[in-house]
């Protein structure tokens, strides 16, 4: 778990939680420490266990106040199909945003006092696997970029 320092009145956390159990554990651990909304940004990997997608959607939507479902190493699969699979488990307030950079920016732009934005699934990884290519991507870097775009009022 990596806390992204910022001067705003909310937390941003990057975590590697990429399995149903890990996602449930991190959300359950964070919940008692969040006075505002718990917002989760996550996706499921492509060419991997399809059965966990709906389960992870249910866990995220049950334990979070808001969820942004996004892309996470789609590999050779269509990211939109992976997100639709996740969506089968979702209810409540959730958004689909296939561009992970935009998903992180959206969650951070909407965060307010006491909130916690959890960016789950990649953790320390600094790449996305898309159609056979390994492209540089860091959740922490994207979170810092989104935070830099926020103006304290």
Q: Which residues are covered by each model-predicted region?
A:
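ATP-dependent carboxylate-amine ligase
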Residues: 2-153
């Amino acid at each position: 778990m990596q806390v992204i320092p910022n001067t705003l009145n909310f937390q941003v956390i990057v975590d590697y939680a990429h399995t149903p159990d890990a996602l449930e554990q991190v959300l359950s651990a964070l919940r008692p420490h969040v006075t505002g909304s718990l917002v989760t940004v996550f996706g499921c990997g492509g060419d991997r266990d399809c059965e966990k997608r709906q389960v992870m959607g249910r866990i995220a939507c049950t334990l979070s106040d808001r969820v942004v479902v996004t892309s996470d190493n789609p590999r050779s699969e269509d990211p939109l199909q992976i997100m639709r699979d996740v969506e089968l488990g979702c209810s409540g307030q959730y958004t689909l945003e296939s561009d992970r950079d935009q998903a992180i920016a959206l969650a951070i732009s909407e965060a307010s006092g006491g909130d916690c934005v959890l960016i789950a699934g990649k953790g320390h990884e600094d790449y996305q696997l898309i159609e056979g290519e390994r492209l540089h991507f860091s959740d922490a870097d994207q979170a810092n970029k989104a935070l830099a775009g926020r103006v304290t009022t």
